[in-house]
Curated annotation (Swiss-Prot):
Gene of this entry: crr
GO molecular function terms noted in the UniProt entry: kinase activity; metal ion binding
Localization per record: Cytoplasm
Catalytic machinery residues: H86
Protein name (database record): PTS system glucose-specific EIIA component
Major localisation: cytoplasm
Role this protein plays: The phosphoenolpyruvate-dependent sugar phosphotransferase system (sugar PTS), a major carbohydrate active transport system, catalyzes the phosphorylation of incoming sugar substrates concomitantly with their translocation across the cell membrane. The enzyme II complex composed of PtsG and Crr is involved in glucose transport.
Length: 166
């Protein structure tokens, strides 16, 4: 009753679509050249081999965490889904060089909102790989995950995963 009185009783959708945060080539999680991601130690997901240097929000929600080294962003949807967008592999070692973060922790975002710009050539030359993992970090709280095996994906437009949360 109190939730209704104070406007916090809105129905939260359990289903959510995750869109491509980068434009490029879809990579199955098992094919990401890093065992932490490929063996799903951090959760279920996919990768993208980007063809341009801009990351957009793959979901509507809020920015939960901007890593100090600018190479990764954590997002959280209203239904509890937690998503990590990790730009490249071993990019933490670049210490923020080549990245420009466009959001702050706590910011509300919609699908397609720009999050980070990065120098694709710099990362390609200075990191292990530009393949960028997108991981559902609370996979254990999902009732179902359906990943569409796409080839080419377009940031903010191509639906890559449907998730139903518990």
């Amino acid at each position: 009753m109190f939730k209704k009185l104070f406007g916090k009783g809105k129905e939260v959708q359990k289903d959510i679509a995750i869109y491509a945060p980068l434009t490029g080539e879809f990579v199955k999680i098992e094919d990401i050249p890093d065992p932490v991601f490929a063996q799903k130690m951090m959760g279920e997901g996919f990768g993208i081999n980007p063809t341009e240097g801009e990351v957009v929000s793959p979901i509507a929600g809020r920015v939960d965490n901007v890593f100090p080294t600018k190479h990764a962003i954590g997002l959280k949807a209203d239904n509890g889904l937690e998503l990590l967008v990790h730009i490249g592999l071993d990019t933490v070692q670049l210490d923020g060089e080549g990245f420009e973060v466009l959001v702050s922790s706590g910011d509300e975002v919609n699908v397609g909102d720009p999050l980070v710009r990065f120098n694709l050539e710099y990362i390609n030359n200075n990191a292990k790989s530009v393949i960028s993992p997108i991981i559902i970090t609370n996979t254990d709280q999902a009732a179902s995950i359906n990943i569409y095996d796409e080839n080419a994906v377009i940031k903010g437009e191509t639906k890559v995963i449907d998730v139903t949360m518990n």
